[in-house]
């Protein structure tokens, strides 16, 4: 049986298509975060970027997202270590830490159903940015410290 590319290649060795396919499409990167100016602590909210289709958990303008959302992140092999706030379930984070992908990951499960059923995606918690007046009212958890 042939091993999957993520089991045989490092993140640096992956093609652009392989890299992109690692994203499970959970939408967690597309939720806004708040940073405390005094402590640099990061607070996660359930406020979704305007470009996120909450039902599908996909960007509605992925190819042109930076034109619509200049603060959108572009995760690359080079800046991956700087995104310490990535969820513990993130494939990029898991592989960078030498861990396997989760059973529900679409590359293993074959679709996104298990991810949504397991509440990994933001489908059932995200609210559209345009409907939110005060992001601080939508903080999900305790802060995630930087570094």
From Swiss-Prot:
It holds the Pfam family CxxCxxCC. Belongs to the UPF0260 family. This is UPF0260 protein PMI1174.
């Amino acid at each position: 049986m042939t091993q999957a590319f993520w089991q045989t290649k490092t993140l640096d060795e992956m093609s652009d298509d392989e890299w992109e396919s690692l994203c499970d499409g959970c939408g967690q990167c597309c939720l806004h975060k708040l940073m405390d100016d005094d402590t640099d602590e990061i607070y996660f909210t359930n406020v979704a970027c305007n470009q996120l289709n909450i039902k599908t958990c996909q960007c509605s303008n992925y190819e042109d997202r930076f034109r619509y959302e200049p603060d959108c992140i572009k995760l690359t092999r080079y800046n991956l270590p700087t995104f310490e706030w990535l969820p513990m379930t993130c494939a990029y984070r898991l592989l960078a830490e030498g861990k396997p992908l989760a059973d529900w990951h679409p590359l293993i499960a074959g679709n996104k159903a298990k991810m949504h059923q397991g509440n990994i995606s933001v489908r059932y918690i995200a609210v559209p940015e345009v409907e939110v007046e005060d992001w601080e009212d939508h903080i999900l958890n305790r802060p995630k410290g930087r570094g």
